[in-house]
């Protein structure tokens, strides 16, 4: 994780970059760009104009672009004495419940993993390891809990297994299936959508707003991740485009600290589902912001993102 700070006129705006090698983005590349210097406008004004000035200097790294979009929005909203959710036109009380991801590396650890997720109403389970293994994982989880489950197939199925699994999962309190096939296999995804009793949510097929027209009628919904799409402005555009097409919307994340997760949470009242647990899956989160109460996201009140430093690390602000 790399933190970006915009410190001007006594106001500090924070942003976070959490790059993913899956999209050929790496921390060292971000640090090299930052070490080379970023040219800023002489006068800091409109957040969108600021971002459009900075983004071309980010080397095409979306995680760095979103970090700058966070920092300017946090700074500008503090300056204007409003929250970011107000800027986005979101109502904090409409923030959804978030799922909690349980990663299954060892079947014997399933009871422990399920217990970790017991404070949440919804679990997210990653499958796509073969029908027999996937069913064994689900059966083991169902022996421990009847919580609603969201399944991420991680591009791991083919059409035959996808049809079988979607029908099988529909009988086991599963809410939807995320990314059943490779992102290049839209034809089989369209076929599965006709056969599946469960909604299909795009992940790798919904990187940014340009992808949405391509998957209309193929998926039932999209997963927006700020680190993939490149800014809160782009995330908001994706929300609007999906709504125009009657598509469901999930807001997801990478492994991020409370800076990135809180930024996404300010957008969450505008979506249907949230999977914003990245800060809960790390042990050294140096910030505090959005919290979870009874499984529901609770946005911090105050100006900007409402994020504050919770550690004594001297190199952080």
Predicted regions and their residues:
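Catalytic alpha/beta core domains of metabolic enzymes, predominantly
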Residues: 184-277
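Metal- or metallocofactor-binding catalytic centers and their adjacent structured scaffolds
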Residues: 6-7, 12-79
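Metal-dependent enolase-superfamily TIM-barrel catalytic cores that perform enediolate-based chemistry
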Residues: 86-196
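Hydrophobic faces of well-ordered beta-strands that scaffold small-molecule active sites
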Residues: 13-15, 96-102, 121-125, 149-153, ...
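Short loop or secondary-structure boundary microenvironments that flank
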Residues: 19, 104, 127, 131, ...
């Amino acid at each position: 994780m790399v933190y970006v700070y915009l410190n001007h006129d006594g106001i500090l705006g924070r942003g976070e970059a959490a790059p993913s090698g899956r999209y050929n983005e790496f921390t060292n590349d971000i640090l090299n760009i930052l070490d080379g210097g970023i040219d800023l406008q002489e006068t800091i004004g409109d957040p969108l104009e600021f971002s459009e000035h900075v983004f071309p200097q980010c080397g095409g790294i979306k995680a760095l672009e979103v970090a700058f979009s966070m920092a300017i929005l946090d700074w500008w909203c503090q300056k204007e004495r409003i929250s970011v959710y107000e800027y986005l036109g979101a109502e904090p009380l409409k923030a959804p419940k978030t799922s909690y991801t349980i990663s299954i590396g060892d079947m014997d650890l399933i009871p422990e993993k399920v217990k970790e997720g017991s404070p949440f109403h919804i679990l997210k389970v990653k499958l796509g390891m073969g029908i027999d293994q996937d069913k064994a994982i689900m059966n083991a989880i169902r022996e421990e809990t009847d919580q609603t489950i969201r399944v991420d197939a991680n591009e791991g199925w083919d059409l035959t297994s996808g049809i079988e699994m979607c029908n099988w999962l529909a009988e086991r309190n599963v809410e939807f299936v995320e990314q059943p096939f490779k992102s290049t296999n839209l034809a089989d995804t369209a076929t599965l959508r006709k056969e599946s009793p469960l909604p299909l949510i795009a992940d790798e097929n919904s990187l940014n707003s340009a992808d949405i027209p391509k998957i209309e009628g193929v998926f039932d919904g999209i997963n927006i991740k700020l680190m993939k799409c490149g800014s809160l402005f782009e995330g908001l555009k994706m929300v609007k485009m999906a709504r125009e097409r009657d598509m469901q919307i999930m807001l997801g994340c990478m492994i991020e600290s409370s800076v990135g997760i809180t930024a996404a949470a300010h957008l969450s009242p505008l979506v249907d589902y949230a999977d914003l647990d990245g800060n809960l899956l790390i042990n050294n989160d140096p910030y505090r912001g959005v919290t979870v109460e009874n499984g529901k996201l609770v946005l911090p009140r105050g100006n900007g993102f409402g994020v504050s430093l919770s550690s004594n690390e001297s190199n952080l602000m």
